[in-house]
A protein has these predicted regions:
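Conserved N-proximal alpha/beta basic substrate-recognition cap immediately N-terminal to
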Residues: 35-156
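Active-site nucleotide/adenylate-binding loops and adjacent lid/helix of ATP-dependent enzymes
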Residues: 111-224, 232
Length: 356
């Protein structure tokens, strides 16, 4: 759908929310809608090796015997729709049944996506070239649909650039995203051929991030994950996090070693220390030494406004996680996710009351 074209009206009936929030939906009620299919599906696709590794990790942390840990993990799957990763990352082993019931688990999140997002419109989010075209007014950088261009067009694009960012068209979790220095290649022809061999989807200019975020970690563009939900009254922001790169990689994704910290929606300040998928807490960034908690997100109000406007473009997608880069001039979209991550919403260092 080209930028500027009016989206077709949704055939999906809006849900009745109050305050534009999912709080009206009891997590247990939502889960029960897809309980049987979830259990059967997970049983068939379960990585049992990883399950038993998780049992061992929890055994080491708690001292509980392995059969008891396994039984509790299975019970949490049946009662709350929690996967074994939910159990470990959210530390279900430290929660009461009442606390566990408040958490958005994998099954609950998947059911919300099924209720709120029309699969016919996933294509505008799953493929980067389609996303960039659909949300062109929010992209804020030069880019090329690489499979559709000639070598001459590519040469014209890179002639005044020292480096470029290349991405697969449908990659997730930062996989396949690279920052390439033009001078590292003997010729433009050689670089063009390499990108063709690698099945690159989009080529784009390197974003310059706001100095406030660059000071925190200059090796990657540290993005905001802002999750929106839409109902008949419009768009609403559910929650937001800052994602921070680590280890010198050009991406900040959690699956690529990054960390995350929750943002206060009213003030734009980081509420707690950062946390990563290895369950490590960071008061300061390990490479820059900058204190994370209390940091002010630059251009915060503009970032929120950007995501609310973007949520209007494809109204059939009512539950979206937006990745936003903040440049010195303005926030811009990096991508949109039709299956927003739910786990970062409720990690132990960020939920001192143990309520999800």
């Amino acid at each position: 759908m080209p930028a500027g074209r009016k989206s077709p009206q949704s055939s999906v009936k809006p849900l009745d929310y109050e305050q534009g929030c999912w709080a009206d939906y009891n997590a247990k009620d939502v889960f029960l809608m897809g309980k049987l299919s979830y259990i059967l599906g997970r049983a068939l696709r379960m990585d049992y090796g990883e399950l038993f590794r998780t049992v061992g990790v929890v055994h080491g942390i708690t001292g509980r015997n392995r059969p008891a840990v396994l039984a509790d993990i299975v019970s949490c799957g049946l009662r709350y729709g929690a996967g074994f990763n939910d159990y470990l990352l959210c530390e279900f082993y430290n929660l009461t049944p009442e606390q566990r019931a408040t958490y958005v688990t994998r099954s609950v999140n998947n059911t919300l996506v099924q209720m709120l997002n029309d699969p016919e419109y996933y294509k505008y989010f799953d493929y980067k070239s389609a996303f960039y075209s659909t949300f062109a007014e929010f992209i804020g950088r030069e880019w090329l649909d690489f499979p559709a261009i000639s070598k001459e067009q590519f040469a014209e694009f890179v002639k005044d650039k020292d480096a470029i960012i290349v991405k697969p068209n449908n990659g997730t979790g930062g996989k396949g995203v690279e920052k390439l220095t033009i001078a590292d290649y003997k010729s433009i022809d050689m670089l063009f051929s390499k990108l063709k061999e690698d099945n690159i989807g989009v080529v784009e200019e390197v974003l310059k991030q706001h100095p406030g975020l660059n000071e925190l970690n200059p090796y990657s563009v540290n993005t905001l994950r802002i999750v929106t939900i839409r109902n008949e009254t419009g768009g609403h922001i559910l929650y937001a996090h800052l994602r921070i790169g680590n280890g010198g990689r050009p991406v900040d994704n959690l699956h690529s070693g990054g960390m995350f910290a929750p943002i206060d929606l009213d003030t734009g300040r980081i509420q707690y220390p950062a946390y990563d998928k290895d369950r490590k807490t960071y008061e300061k960034h390990p490479m820059s030494g900058v204190t994370i908690q209390g940091m002010q997100i630059p251009l915060w109000e503009q970032a929120k406004e950007l995501c609310l406007k973007a949520s209007e473009v494809v109204p059939q997608m009512r539950y979206v996680g937006w990745d936003v880069a903040v440049t010195p001039e303005r926030p811009v979209l990096v991508e949109g996710n039709n299956l927003p991550g739910y786990d970062i919403l409720q990690m132990p260092p960020h939920t001192p009351d143990k309520i999800g």
